[in-house]
UniProtKB/Swiss-Prot annotation:
Protein name, UniProt field: UPS-like protein C36.10
Family according to the record: Belongs to the slowmo family.
UniProt cross-references to PROSITE patterns, sorted A to Z: PRELI_MSF1
InterPro entries attached to this UniProt entry: PRELI/MSF1_dom, Slowmo/Ups
Length: 184
């Protein structure tokens, strides 16, 4: 098993980041995301907003991986999210549904307010494991997956930044959040 970890500080307040999460796709940095479908949404007894979504992605995979997975390039990911307004956290749990009998990818992302700044802390961990049928190639597959995950995570953060910027500019029309001067 390999683990990918990442931390980032979004220069926007938690309320804006958590609201923007629902508008994250599509964006120009995540063109591999084809569709995001909401399967379930409800407020739990403890007041937490629970949402389950199906994310459809088109992966550009190397030929040697395509041979291992029978040539399928579209994959499905299950995302469950928990928005806890009292604790001021947004937690996302994602797992791949496609190829999960060969390669398991479980990701946890948490957004929470920075304790001192008007910003939001992003923490990400992905556990990637090639399963028994792939043991001979597991290290190679896991490392390739971690490297690819890191690249997509970086583009994902860039894409989310652009979504936040667009929302910020449309909400505050003449000046970005936190700016003291108006823009033309």
């Amino acid at each position: 098993m390999k683990i990918f970890e990442s931390c980032h500080l979004f220069q926007y307040p938690f309320e804006q980041v958590s609201a923007a999460h629902w508008q994250k796709y599509p964006n120009e940095h995540a063109t591999h995301v084809i569709a995001v479908d909401t399967l379930d949404r409800k407020v739990l007894d403890n007041g937490v907003l629970y949402t389950e979504r199906l994310i459809t992605c088109h992966q550009a995979l190397p030929r040697w991986i395509l041979k291992l997975i029978d040539g399928a390039q579209d994959c499905y990911i299950r995302e469950t999210s928990y928005v806890d307004l009292k604790a001021r956290t947004l937690t996302l749990l994602t797992s791949n549904l496609t190829f999960s009998d060969r390669l398991r990818v479980d990701e946890t992302v948490t957004y929470s307010p920075h304790p001192e700044l008007e910003a939001t802390v992003f923490q990400q961990e992905a556990r990637i494991e090639a399963l028994a049928c792939m043991k001979r190639l597991s290290n190679l597959i896991e490392q390739w997956s971690v490297d690819g995950f890191g690249k997509k995570a970086s583009r994902g953060k860039e894409g989310f930044e652009s979504v936040l910027e667009k929302i910020n500019m449309s909400v505050f029309q003449t000046r970005p959040f936190g700016s003291s001067e108006a823009t033309a």
